[in-house]
Amino acid sequence: VLDENDWEGYQIATKELTRTLLIGDDLTVTNPALLKRAHEESAVQGFIFKPNQIGTITEAVEAHRYAKEHNMLTIPSQRGGGTIWDVVIDLGVGLETEACKSCAPRGGESVYAMNCLYRAAQENPDAALFDFSPLVKF
């Protein structure tokens, strides 16, 4: 298990775990400066998008833009046990992120997230699913 400040460990893991995508969460905390460092040091291939970690939606979107410009994944994270009206999944749809992280649809917040994705698919029937095949390392 890597510590949230173990930059060298993440670099080694990214290099050695060739069949695994390493995604920053506590390492990058949706912080554009930390995401840039993680990219420059080849520490992760993407990040968990949580605007509450960095503090503003503006900074979170800036991190997403940096990731997109550098072919990194942005993965919005809907909080299990969080509020029903959490906008993180909505932001992910609006930003056209590659994936989202959610728990099983057992509580109101996860059902809300699934419904958000369902509505987006209904409103955009021509939208293509993200092709993960170039990222599969098997």
Locate the predicted segments by residue.
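Catalytic core of soluble alpha/beta enzymes
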Residues: 1-138
